[in-house]
Amino acid sequence: MKQQILDILVELEKWRAERKLSTESQREGYIRNVMEELGELAEAIKTNSEHEYIDALCDIVVFAGNCVNKEKFDEAFIPWETMEESFVNLHEDTLLKSMFANASEMTHSPNISIASLYSFCKDLAAKKGYDFFKCMKEVLKQINSRTGAWNEDLKKWVKDTSPKAKSKEYQADFDKCKLN
């Protein structure tokens, strides 16, 4: 799991660099942005939409990962490795509550929280039959294909939703991320 998270953090670091964003700028709007994604997750649960559910989990990890300095991640990960296995058999409701609590801790200790948040999301995706790392790679392809601009009021990168931009945007294909 550690290498998967590091791979994601490297991709997010490239994404931020291309857009001249910093982890600090990402932390400023984190709570509002992740709350929006949690709302999308709740809607996906309500409507039983698997793809929207997976997309919301991935977006939560994207927002969280954009708050993390990958150089400091290594030292924070060591204590988490010993606890990860104990979460695999938790009920989905417990995982969701734990993920929500952990997502709100990102602003205080992002380098530790990303490991637990990723683990919760990975387990939630697995319960729906998806390989979360493959899903994350699909979402990273999608966000890398987007154009847009930083919105200072929202404290986030806002994608261009024009028809031209939408026609060029890669769409994450979660069907190829199913567990065997």
Model region roles, listed by residue range:
Residues 1-180:
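Flexible "arm" and connector segments at domain edges
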